[in-house]
């Protein structure tokens, strides 16, 4: 039993929630933090590349940031970038990262979001894992035996609208024109980001934990139901 070092925590410590690629100096700071974490006893590196600020990494950026692990038996465990319409591309991305670095890969909470992705997609996923194993990649995954997933409500937003941290997000949501732009994106299927709104619908997205006292009575209700009580469009 042990701990993993969080790649997102490391990146946030180096660059905060600022958008864009890491500079060379920032990459070296990330390497130092990774090496220090491993020296302190971390058993591997945990990634959440669907989430801020890690979604700022592209595939090559991940390979660069994880160079201290190259050729070791130190694993990466990752929430993939997209568990919906783009799940196969998202899996190919992390498999290719592990393969280039020659390190073990564990995919966290393997699932297909959206009923339209339940049919042949799981078969294709298993084929990807089998093909990777045949090439010598050490790869596995975990899953939970129920249909409900969980995440932060902010993760419903497209990645470009999450940049800059909480204050920047709140400023965007307070702007009617920005909300209109967000709504337009959320109403379209995407293999670029995990569009949970389009995949599940507001009637299947529930608020489970609300920290503000005046809103706590809405815990356990769907976003669609909450919006109805406020007389508002769920997208707002």
Listing of model-derived features with the role each one plays in the protein:
Residues 2-8:
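Mobile "lid/hinge" segments at catalytic clefts and subdomain interfaces of large enzymes
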Residues 4, 13, 17-24, 30-51, ...:
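Active-site neighborhoods of metal-dependent hydrolases
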Residues 11-12, 86:
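Short active-site-adjacent helix-start/loop capping segments
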Residues 24-28, 56-59, 88, 119:
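Short, amphipathic alpha-helical segments
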Residues 36-93:
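Divalent metal-binding pocket/active-site signature
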């Amino acid at each position: 039993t042990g701990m993993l070092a969080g790649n997102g925590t490391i990146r946030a410590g180096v660059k905060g929630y600022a958008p864009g690629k890491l500079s060379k100096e920032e990459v070296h700071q990330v390497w130092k933090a990774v090496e220090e974490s491993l020296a302190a006893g971390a058993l591997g590196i945990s990634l959440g590349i669907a989430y801020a600020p890690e979604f700022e990494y592209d595939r090559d950026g991940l390979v660069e940031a994880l160079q201290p692990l190259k050729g070791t038996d130190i694993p990466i465990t990752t929430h993939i970038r997209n568990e919906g319409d783009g799940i196969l591309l998202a899996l190919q991305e992390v498999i290719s990262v592990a393969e280039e670095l020659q390190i073990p890969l564990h995919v966290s909470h393997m699932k297909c979001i959206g009923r339209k992705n339940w049919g042949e997609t799981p078969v294709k996923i298993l084929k990807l894992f089998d093909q990777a194993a045949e090439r010598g990649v050490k790869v596995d995954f975990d899953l939970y035996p129920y249909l409900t997933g969980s995440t932060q409500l902010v993760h419903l937003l497209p990645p470009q609208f999450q940049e800059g941290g909480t204050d920047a997000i709140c400023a965007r949501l307070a702007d009617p024109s920005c909300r209109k732009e967000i709504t337009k994106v959320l109403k379209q299927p995407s293999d670029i980001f995990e569009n949970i709104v389009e995949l599940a619908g507001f009637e299947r997205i529930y608020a489970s934990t609300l920290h503000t006292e005046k809103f706590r009575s809405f815990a356990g209700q769907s976003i669609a139901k909450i919006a109805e009580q406020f007389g508002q469009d769920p997208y707002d």
